[in-house]
Amino acid sequence: MKKLNIIFAGTPDISAQVLKDLYKSQHNIQAVLTQPDRAKGRGKKVQFSPVKEVALANHTPVFQPLSFKKNPEVLEQIKQLKPDVIVVIAYGIIVPQEFLDIPRYGCLNIHVSLLPKWRGAAPIQRAIQAGDTKTGVCIMQMDAGLDTGDILNTLEIEIQETDTSQTLHDKFAKLSIKPLLETLEKIEIIKPEPQQGEPTYAHKITKQEGLIDFTKSAWQISCHIRAFTPWPGAYFILDDEAIKVGEFEILYQNTDNRKAGTIIDIYRSGFDIATSDKIIRFRQLQFPNKKMLNIVDILNGKDLDKYIGYKLG
């Protein structure tokens, strides 16, 4: 395999894992692009992005432009490096055409969906929310559009019924390096393929989307909860408080035709609520300013029986 000079652009954990794996290959990482450092927490302590941490540990130069309009000098610095390829995954900063034109073999984007399905910001969450049974990693030749470039390689992944956005994210973090290295190996001869099919869009997640609609089926609610785990978290409103849900299971049919959203019963093992077709049991709940707890632990300090028969929403 030919040794390539690569510039890597990414910011969060998933990007950091791919970068770690890329360092293990024979390719040369010339520089890393990541978002600017952020002040976080009560003490406003400056934190580096996960990608920056990995780059510094490997003694690689790091560029952190606020934007390429505000920091045009970064483009010039990248041009001087004359990279063969720029690899991008979850960078989070818009790149201009001038950036895309720099590398010899173009810019490769690692996108975690089977394009053209779920273009955009939240492909993992939207795939689970929609009840998809499969997803994948696409290595895409970047162009000026939103995830519209030609496909160079694909790795398909099954979505299990127990997968959350966190577990699927972790799978992508481990598996994305395989199709990337395959693509880099054949970069001189690989034939880009235009995306086929009707595109769908994975719009950015909002905090308010976590609210559970119990008029939906138990399966739809399961998809909703798993899609929004860990963030923003799925929840229902009880006594004007947002109660986040944790572990759950789908039980028997709603044979008594209880109205969707009715709290059927509360046991030490769970909190049972009717959906449009079945009963769903929540084994864990999180009340405001509290930790996520098993129902048995909540019952030790809180009277929940008074809510039996109460209809949510």
UniProtKB/Swiss-Prot annotation:
<dbReference type="InterPro" id="IPR001555">
    <property type="entry name" value="GART_AS"/>
</dbReference>
<protein>
    <recommendedName>
        <fullName>Methionyl-tRNA formyltransferase</fullName>
        <ecNumber>2.1.2.9</ecNumber>
    </recommendedName>
</protein>
<dbReference type="InterPro" id="IPR005793">
    <property type="entry name" value="Formyl_trans_C"/>
</dbReference>
<dbReference type="Pfam" id="PF02911">
    <property type="entry name" value="Formyl_trans_C"/>
</dbReference>
<dbReference type="GO" id="GO:0004479">
    <property type="term" value="F:methionyl-tRNA formyltransferase activity"/>
</dbReference>
<dbReference type="InterPro" id="IPR011034">
    <property type="entry name" value="Formyl_transferase-like_C_sf"/>
</dbReference>
<dbReference type="Pfam" id="PF00551">
    <property type="entry name" value="Formyl_trans_N"/>
</dbReference>
<dbReference type="InterPro" id="IPR002376">
    <property type="entry name" value="Formyl_transf_N"/>
</dbReference>
<comment type="function">
    <text>Attaches a formyl group to the free amino group of methionyl-tRNA(fMet). The formyl group appears to play a dual role in the initiator identity of N-formylmethionyl-tRNA by promoting its recognition by IF2 and preventing the misappropriation of this tRNA by the elongation apparatus.</text>
</comment>
<feature type="binding site">
    <location>
        <begin position="113"/>
        <end position="116"/>
    </location>
    <ligand>
        <name>(6S)-5,6,7,8-tetrahydrofolate</name>
    </ligand>
</feature>
<keyword id="KW-0808">Transferase</keyword>
<dbReference type="InterPro" id="IPR005794">
    <property type="entry name" value="Fmt"/>
</dbReference>
<dbReference type="InterPro" id="IPR044135">
    <property type="entry name" value="Met-tRNA-FMT_C"/>
</dbReference>
<dbReference type="GO" id="GO:0005829">
    <property type="term" value="C:cytosol"/>
</dbReference>
<keyword id="KW-0648">Protein biosynthesis</keyword>
<comment type="similarity">
    <text>Belongs to the Fmt family.</text>
</comment>
<dbReference type="InterPro" id="IPR036477">
    <property type="entry name" value="Formyl_transf_N_sf"/>
</dbReference>
<dbReference type="InterPro" id="IPR041711">
    <property type="entry name" value="Met-tRNA-FMT_N"/>
</dbReference>
